[in-house]
Amino acid sequence: MAAAPAALALDPQPQEEQKDASESSELSRLRAELAGALAEMETMKAVAEVSESTKAEAVAAVQRQCQEEVASLQAILKDSISSYETQIAALKQERQQQQQDSEEKERELGHLKQLLARAHPLDSLEKQMEKAHEDSEKLREIVLPMEQEIAELKVKLLRAEELIQEIQRRPRQPASLHGSTELLPLSRNPSPPLEPSEEPSGDAGPAAEAFAHNCDDSASISSFSLGGAAGSVSLRGPQGLSPEQEETASLVSTGTLVPEGIYLPPPGYQLVPDSQWEQLQVEGRQLQKELESVRRERDELQEGLSRSNEDCAKQMQVLLAQVQNSEQLLRTLQGTVSQAQERVQRQMAELATSHKCLSQEVKRLNEENRGLRAEQLPSSALQGSEQQEDQDEALPSSIQELHQLVRHTRQQARARQQAQEHEAERLRIEIVKLREALDEETAAKASLEGQLRVQREETDVLEASLCSLRIETERVQQEHHKAQLTDLLSEQRAKALRLQAELETSEQVQRDFVRLSQALQVRLEQIRQADTLEQVRSILDEAPLRDIKDIKDS
């Protein structure tokens, strides 16, 4: 009968070993999750660095290519100025739109911070942990006296068994039974209580996310719109005419600028000699070839510029896709954080309800224990006094009566011992259950606190990375926009200078043609007014009018 309590006392050891094994497995799983989160954070950092480097390289390459192409462009017309003004207005609108988008995102981030601040009731969690610690201390104070009482009951049972064995060994000495009940001293040396094991709570390191980030760059470099008829004044004729017809039409058009006092020859009369006419035709062909080469060069430059624009647009699309992926990852992480917080809150509510139930159960057991102690003390005192009176009144006078008395005493002791063992076993089982429930509750609270701490650290890291990414994106956008505006300003200045030079050149060429035609008309009028052939020859022997320099020299 004494071996049963010892076996029951050894039962919590395998349970504690199983609990340690489960805690070690849970700790290893948490470490694996931490390692995975750290690896994911490293990959996110690498992806962000690669995206930033590729973006900077792409922007630098596009800027270099645009500068090289813009430096080599020629023959820009006046109509491009209005188109670039509209493009600048569109860029300003895009900048305003980007500023509005950034303000909306900042408002969303502030709302998210408010939600996170509401979802982290740190003060209430600390109060609940302190309350749980106080409840565990109260349970320990209740369990220790119960264990002491159980130890005292065990000692009493052992003394009763020893007394019965002594009575069995000495059946022939009836006087030795007198006052046998006085040999039952009560031992008040309680056995040392078993302290509940404390479970370590592991702290997990911070984890990331990534990245994410929001980069709405717009890199659109417009192609130059080159018109054909406005820049080549007095150098080209209407389409569909031969070079000879173009030269004739140009001379006819300049004839309108001749003063009315000059005599006009009849139609069909040859105004220019054949050599000069051929020379003018050769010059016209050369100018036309140069114009065609300039057009081809312009088309090639436009194609190269369009290709560079397409490449830049593709690179910007790739960067935008990466930013969207990082934002999606951030949103998923925020969703998981919110779900984990809701789950933690539900588990805390369940633990609070279970804690209340356990406290009520402990109170009930305490009341039962007090009632049992109150019942046992009067019954034992009454039984002892009755036995003393019976033994004093009627002592056995024969061996048979002595045997009957011993048998009756043994049955009473056995029944009392069984009742006490059953009661002690029931109390021990309830104590073990309460201790296990308390340990589970403590472990659950520790794990929930660790998860909450990890989620809070991950949220802080993600918020910091999001802020840094947004700041970097805004800086890159401002630098890119500033570079675009600087390039556009330099292009507009260069275009204005080229257009001014072309306008002056075209006006000078027109004036030279007018002077040349006037000089030819004057020479022809002199020949027509000559009286003799010698005068005509002298006029023809003068310096030929092949260039405007001949007019200035003459």
From Swiss-Prot:
Keyword Protein transport attributed: yes
Keyword NAD assigned: no
Basic and acidic residues bias spans: 16-29
Entry-linked InterPro entries: Rabaptin, Rabaptin_coiled-coil, Rabaptin_Rab5-bd_dom
Annotated region (Disordered), positions in chain: 1-29, 167-250, 375-395
GO MF annotations in UniProt: growth factor activity; GTPase activator activity
A biological process from GO: endocytosis
Subcellular location: Cytoplasm; Early endosome; Cytoplasm, Cytoskeleton, Microtubule organizing center, Centrosome; Cytoplasm, Cytoskeleton, Cilium basal body
Residue ranges the record marks as coiled coil: 15-173, 274-512
Low complexity biased stretches: 1-15
Modified residues (Phosphoserine): 176, 180, 187, 191
Compositionally biased tracts (Polar residues): 377-386
Pfam families in alphabetical order: Rab5-bind, Rabaptin
Keywords on record: Cell projection, Cilium biogenesis/degradation, Coiled coil, Cytoplasm, Cytoskeleton, Endocytosis, Endosome, Phosphoprotein, Protein transport, Transport
Subunit structure: Heterodimer with RABGEF1. The dimer binds RAB5A that has been activated by GTP-binding. Interacts with SDCCAG8; this interaction is important for ciliogenesis regulation. Interacts with RAB4A; this interaction may mediate VEGFR2 cell surface expression.
Family: Belongs to the rabaptin family.
Function: Plays a role in membrane trafficking and in homotypic early endosome fusion. Participates in arteriogenesis by regulating vascular endothelial growth factor receptor 2/VEGFR2 cell surface expression and endosomal trafficking. By interacting with SDCCAG8, localizes to centrosomes and plays a critical role in ciliogenesis.
Name by which UniProt lists this protein: Rab GTPase-binding effector protein 2
